[in-house]
Amino acid sequence: KKPRVGVVGEILVKFHPAANNHLVELLESEGAEAVVPDLTDFLLYCFYNTGFKADNLGMSQKSKKIGRLGINFFEWLRSAARDEFTKSRHFTAPAHIDDLARYARDIVSEGNQTGEGWFLTGEMLELIHTGTPNIVCTQPFACLPNHVVGKGVIKELRHRYPGSNIVAIDYDPGASEVNQLNRIKLMLSTANKNLAKQNAPEQKDQAAGLSLIHI
Protein backbone atom coordinates (compact mmCIF):
# COMPACT_ATOMS: atom_id res chain seq x y z
CA LYS A 1 0.00 0.00 0.00
CA LYS A 2 1.01 3.59 -0.62
CA PRO A 3 0.39 6.34 1.94
CA ARG A 4 -2.53 8.50 0.81
CA VAL A 5 -1.89 12.24 1.03
CA GLY A 6 -4.69 14.77 0.63
CA VAL A 7 -4.11 18.21 -0.87
CA VAL A 8 -6.33 21.05 0.37
CA GLY A 9 -6.04 24.80 0.75
CA GLU A 10 -6.50 28.08 -1.09
CA ILE A 11 -8.12 27.31 -4.42
CA LEU A 12 -5.36 28.58 -6.75
CA VAL A 13 -2.45 27.09 -4.80
CA LYS A 14 -4.36 23.83 -4.36
CA PHE A 15 -5.04 23.19 -8.04
CA HIS A 16 -2.41 25.06 -10.08
CA PRO A 17 0.91 23.18 -10.41
CA ALA A 18 2.86 26.39 -11.01
CA ALA A 19 1.48 27.87 -7.77
CA ASN A 20 2.29 24.84 -5.57
CA ASN A 21 5.63 23.87 -7.14
CA HIS A 22 4.08 20.75 -8.75
CA LEU A 23 3.03 19.32 -5.39
CA VAL A 24 1.06 16.36 -6.79
CA GLU A 25 4.02 15.28 -8.95
CA LEU A 26 6.30 15.59 -5.92
CA LEU A 27 4.06 13.43 -3.73
CA GLU A 28 3.77 10.75 -6.43
CA SER A 29 7.53 10.77 -7.07
CA GLU A 30 8.03 10.14 -3.34
CA GLY A 31 5.80 7.05 -3.49
CA ALA A 32 2.57 8.54 -2.14
CA GLU A 33 -0.93 8.57 -3.60
CA ALA A 34 -2.12 12.16 -3.99
CA VAL A 35 -5.82 12.78 -3.24
CA VAL A 36 -7.16 16.13 -4.47
CA PRO A 37 -10.85 16.84 -3.72
CA ASP A 38 -13.12 18.12 -6.52
CA LEU A 39 -13.18 21.69 -7.78
CA THR A 40 -16.97 21.27 -8.07
CA ASP A 41 -17.19 21.13 -4.27
CA PHE A 42 -15.99 24.73 -4.04
CA LEU A 43 -18.88 25.84 -6.26
CA LEU A 44 -21.30 23.88 -4.08
CA TYR A 45 -19.79 25.59 -1.02
CA CYS A 46 -20.62 28.97 -2.57
CA PHE A 47 -24.21 27.83 -3.16
CA TYR A 48 -24.46 26.45 0.39
CA ASN A 49 -23.35 29.75 1.94
CA THR A 50 -26.49 31.50 0.69
CA GLY A 51 -28.51 29.46 3.20
CA PHE A 52 -26.51 30.70 6.19
CA LYS A 53 -26.58 34.27 4.91
CA ALA A 54 -30.35 34.14 4.43
CA ASP A 55 -30.95 32.72 7.91
CA ASN A 56 -28.46 34.89 9.80
CA LEU A 57 -27.23 37.85 7.76
CA GLY A 58 -30.31 39.28 6.07
CA MET A 59 -29.89 37.85 2.58
CA SER A 60 -33.15 37.15 0.76
CA GLN A 61 -34.83 33.77 1.04
CA LYS A 62 -34.96 33.74 -2.76
CA SER A 63 -31.15 33.56 -2.85
CA LYS A 64 -31.27 30.65 -0.41
CA LYS A 65 -33.71 28.77 -2.65
CA ILE A 66 -31.58 29.44 -5.73
CA GLY A 67 -28.51 28.18 -3.86
CA ARG A 68 -30.29 24.98 -2.88
CA LEU A 69 -31.48 24.49 -6.47
CA GLY A 70 -27.88 24.87 -7.62
CA ILE A 71 -26.72 22.25 -5.10
CA ASN A 72 -29.46 19.82 -6.12
CA PHE A 73 -28.67 20.28 -9.81
CA PHE A 74 -24.93 19.66 -9.50
CA GLU A 75 -25.42 16.76 -7.10
CA TRP A 76 -27.86 15.24 -9.62
CA LEU A 77 -25.28 15.67 -12.40
CA ARG A 78 -22.65 13.71 -10.51
CA SER A 79 -24.99 11.21 -8.84
CA ALA A 80 -24.24 8.52 -11.45
CA ALA A 81 -20.49 8.94 -10.94
CA ARG A 82 -20.93 8.88 -7.15
CA ASP A 83 -22.91 5.63 -7.36
CA GLU A 84 -20.19 3.97 -9.44
CA PHE A 85 -17.40 5.26 -7.20
CA THR A 86 -19.27 3.87 -4.19
CA LYS A 87 -19.38 0.42 -5.80
CA SER A 88 -15.67 0.53 -6.67
CA ARG A 89 -12.87 -0.67 -4.40
CA HIS A 90 -10.35 1.65 -6.05
CA PHE A 91 -12.06 5.05 -5.91
CA THR A 92 -13.62 7.21 -3.20
CA ALA A 93 -16.99 8.84 -3.85
CA PRO A 94 -17.11 12.61 -3.21
CA ALA A 95 -19.00 13.65 -0.09
CA HIS A 96 -22.23 15.65 -0.31
CA ILE A 97 -21.77 19.33 0.55
CA ASP A 98 -24.25 18.92 3.43
CA ASP A 99 -21.94 16.27 4.91
CA LEU A 100 -18.93 18.59 4.63
CA ALA A 101 -20.87 21.30 6.46
CA ARG A 102 -21.88 18.84 9.17
CA TYR A 103 -18.25 17.73 9.63
CA ALA A 104 -17.01 21.31 9.94
CA ARG A 105 -19.83 22.60 12.14
CA ASP A 106 -18.40 21.05 15.31
CA ILE A 107 -15.14 22.96 14.92
CA VAL A 108 -15.80 26.22 13.04
CA SER A 109 -18.92 28.29 12.40
CA GLU A 110 -20.52 28.28 8.97
CA GLY A 111 -20.21 32.06 9.23
CA ASN A 112 -16.54 31.64 8.32
CA GLN A 113 -17.06 32.27 4.60
CA THR A 114 -14.06 34.38 3.59
CA GLY A 115 -11.96 32.52 1.06
CA GLU A 116 -12.38 28.77 1.56
CA GLY A 117 -13.95 29.38 4.99
CA TRP A 118 -15.47 26.41 6.79
CA PHE A 119 -15.20 24.41 3.55
CA LEU A 120 -11.45 23.97 4.10
CA THR A 121 -12.04 22.43 7.53
CA GLY A 122 -14.78 20.23 6.07
CA GLU A 123 -12.45 18.98 3.32
CA MET A 124 -9.79 17.97 5.83
CA LEU A 125 -12.37 16.10 7.89
CA GLU A 126 -13.72 14.39 4.77
CA LEU A 127 -10.21 13.17 3.94
CA ILE A 128 -9.67 11.87 7.48
CA HIS A 129 -13.04 10.05 7.45
CA THR A 130 -12.28 8.40 4.09
CA GLY A 131 -8.88 6.96 4.99
CA THR A 132 -6.56 9.84 4.10
CA PRO A 133 -5.16 11.07 7.42
CA ASN A 134 -2.07 12.63 5.78
CA ILE A 135 -2.84 16.13 4.52
CA VAL A 136 -0.91 19.02 2.98
CA CYS A 137 -2.72 22.31 3.63
CA THR A 138 -1.49 24.75 0.97
CA GLN A 139 -1.77 28.49 1.36
CA PRO A 140 -0.31 31.71 -0.07
CA PHE A 141 2.05 33.45 2.32
CA ALA A 142 0.14 35.45 4.97
CA CYS A 143 -3.31 34.28 3.78
CA LEU A 144 -5.39 35.28 6.81
CA PRO A 145 -8.51 33.13 6.10
CA ASN A 146 -6.35 30.02 5.77
CA HIS A 147 -4.57 30.80 9.02
CA VAL A 148 -7.97 30.73 10.77
CA VAL A 149 -9.78 27.79 9.12
CA GLY A 150 -6.71 25.87 7.88
CA LYS A 151 -3.65 26.16 10.08
CA GLY A 152 -5.84 27.35 12.97
CA VAL A 153 -7.80 24.08 13.23
CA ILE A 154 -4.90 21.64 12.80
CA LYS A 155 -4.31 21.40 16.57
CA GLU A 156 -7.98 20.55 17.18
CA LEU A 157 -7.99 17.97 14.38
CA ARG A 158 -4.90 16.30 15.84
CA HIS A 159 -6.59 16.27 19.24
CA ARG A 160 -9.78 14.65 17.89
CA TYR A 161 -8.00 12.35 15.42
CA PRO A 162 -4.61 11.34 16.89
CA GLY A 163 -3.72 9.47 13.70
CA SER A 164 -4.00 12.60 11.55
CA ASN A 165 -0.76 13.87 10.02
CA ILE A 166 -1.26 17.42 8.75
CA VAL A 167 1.28 19.98 7.58
CA ALA A 168 0.59 23.57 6.48
CA ILE A 169 2.83 24.84 3.68
CA ASP A 170 3.16 28.51 2.69
CA TYR A 171 3.76 29.16 -1.01
CA ASP A 172 5.31 32.46 -2.02
CA PRO A 173 7.84 33.51 -4.69
CA GLY A 174 10.21 34.51 -1.91
CA ALA A 175 9.72 31.34 0.16
CA SER A 176 12.44 28.71 0.28
CA GLU A 177 11.50 25.71 -1.86
CA VAL A 178 13.99 23.62 0.11
CA ASN A 179 12.11 24.39 3.34
CA GLN A 180 8.83 23.38 1.67
CA LEU A 181 10.36 20.11 0.47
CA ASN A 182 11.80 19.32 3.89
CA ARG A 183 8.45 19.81 5.63
CA ILE A 184 6.62 17.71 3.03
CA LYS A 185 9.21 14.92 3.26
CA LEU A 186 8.99 14.95 7.06
CA MET A 187 5.22 14.53 6.76
CA LEU A 188 5.73 11.66 4.28
CA SER A 189 8.21 10.01 6.65
CA THR A 190 5.58 10.04 9.41
CA ALA A 191 2.96 8.77 6.94
CA ASN A 192 5.16 5.81 5.97
CA LYS A 193 5.84 4.96 9.63
CA ASN A 194 2.12 5.04 10.45
CA LEU A 195 1.35 2.87 7.42
CA ALA A 196 4.00 0.34 8.47
CA LYS A 197 2.40 0.12 11.93
CA GLN A 198 -1.02 -0.51 10.36
CA ASN A 199 0.38 -3.21 8.07
CA ALA A 200 2.31 -5.02 10.84
CA PRO A 201 -0.71 -6.96 12.28
CA GLU A 202 -1.78 -8.01 8.75
CA GLN A 203 1.71 -9.28 7.98
CA LYS A 204 1.74 -11.26 11.26
CA ASP A 205 -1.60 -12.85 10.40
CA GLN A 206 -0.36 -13.76 6.93
CA ALA A 207 2.84 -15.25 8.36
CA ALA A 208 0.83 -17.29 10.89
CA GLY A 209 -1.40 -18.56 8.10
CA LEU A 210 1.59 -19.62 6.01
CA SER A 211 3.08 -21.43 9.01
CA LEU A 212 -0.13 -23.41 9.53
CA ILE A 213 -0.21 -24.33 5.84
CA HIS A 214 3.42 -25.48 6.01
CA ILE A 215 2.68 -27.67 9.05
Task: Give each language-model segment a name.
Residues 54-63, 185-196:
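A polyampholytic, Gly/Pro-enriched intrinsically disordered region
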Residues 44-46, 143-144, 201:
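Functionally engaged cysteine thiol sites
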Residues 192-197, 202, 210-211:
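Acidic, low-complexity intrinsically disordered regions
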Residues 16-32, 97-194:
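Hydrophobic alpha/beta core scaffold segments
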